[in-house]
């Protein structure tokens, strides 16, 4: 049985690529045709790639691999947070900060600072500080929660990164390459399939397309860990 059906992908608009002038020729094998100046992705190829990606991710989850979801564009941010949380993965959905992976020791210290501030806030310790100092601490807390909140349970580097919009998250791709972390990536027609390990050719701009693909990958993680699609927890 297919992980995603052609009708599901059509309804989600997963077949719409970018304008033909913006394409990457390396994506040619995944393109069905051009229509009104826009490339149309071959959804038969997408279905095959999605089946392969589902099996790959499920196997990785079954063997205990840890996942990081990355998608910072507006139409992906909410989906990334919801689906990563549902399968117990970590996530970045606001902005990729340079060195998030390659300078992990520093990033880990910032995450610990976030946890300390959260404990101070919940215990009332911040409220007991002078008004100006409390305001500074709360601004720091808000900033850390915004950018690092999805990484609070990530105790070490991820084993797999799931990526939306390769062009936008290019710095994340480079850090993964440097650290030999495999990347599962949605690939629109302007992307480079050589920069990922597990390609999924599809529209990475439409919310419904992102929801469909990322939701199925979250299902694969839960199935690999628990034999079902119920919520998981990486711990």
Curated annotation (Swiss-Prot):
One of its GO terms (biological process) is translation. Gene3D superfamilies: Glucose-6-phosphate isomerase like protein, domain 1, Helix hairpin bin. It holds the Pfam family Ribosomal_S2. One of its GO terms (cellular component) is cytosolic small ribosomal subunit. The keyword Zinc does not apply. It comes from the Bacteria. Keywords: Ribonucleoprotein, Ribosomal protein. GO terms for molecular function: structural constituent of ribosome. PROSITE patterns: RIBOSOMAL_S2_1. SUPFAM superfamilies: Ribosomal protein S2. The keyword Endoplasmic reticulum does not apply. InterPro entries: Ribosomal_uS2, Ribosomal_uS2_bac/mit/plastid, Ribosomal_uS2_CS, Ribosomal_uS2_flav_dom_sf. NCBIfam families: rpsB_bact (TIGR01011). HAMAP family: Ribosomal_uS2_B. Belongs to the universal ribosomal protein uS2 family. This is Small ribosomal subunit protein uS2. It comes from Synechococcus sp. (strain RCC307).
């Amino acid at each position: 049985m297919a992980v995603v059906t052609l009708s599901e992908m059509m309804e989600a608009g997963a077949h719409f690529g970018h304008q033909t002038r913006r394409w990457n020729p390396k994506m040619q094998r995944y393109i069905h045709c051009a229509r009104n100046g826009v490339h149309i992705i071959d959804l038969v190829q997408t279905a095959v790639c999605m089946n392969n990606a589902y099996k790959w991710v499920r196997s990785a989850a079954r063997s205990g691999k840890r996942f990081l979801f990355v998608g910072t564009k507006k139409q992906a941010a909410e989906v990334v947070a919801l689906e990563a949380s549902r399968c117990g993965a970590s996530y970045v959905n606001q902005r990729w900060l340079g060195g998030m992976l390659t300078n992990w020791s520093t990033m880990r210290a910032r995450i610990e600072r976030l946890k300390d501030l959260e404990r101070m806030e919940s215990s009332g310790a911040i409220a007991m500080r002078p008004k100006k100092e409390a305001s500074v601490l709360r601004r720091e807390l808000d900033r850390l929660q915004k950018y690092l909140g999805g990484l609070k349970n990530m105790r070490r580097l991820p084993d797999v990164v799931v990526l939306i919009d390769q062009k936008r998250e290019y710095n994340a791709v480079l850090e993964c390459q440097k650290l030999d972390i495999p990347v599962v990536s949605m690939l629109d027609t302007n992307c480079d399939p050589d920069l990922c390990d597990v390609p999924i050719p599809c529209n990475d701009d439409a919310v419904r397309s992102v929801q469909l693909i990322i939701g199925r990958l979250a299902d694969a993680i839960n199935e690999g860990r628990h034999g079902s699609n119920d919520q998981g927890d990486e711990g």
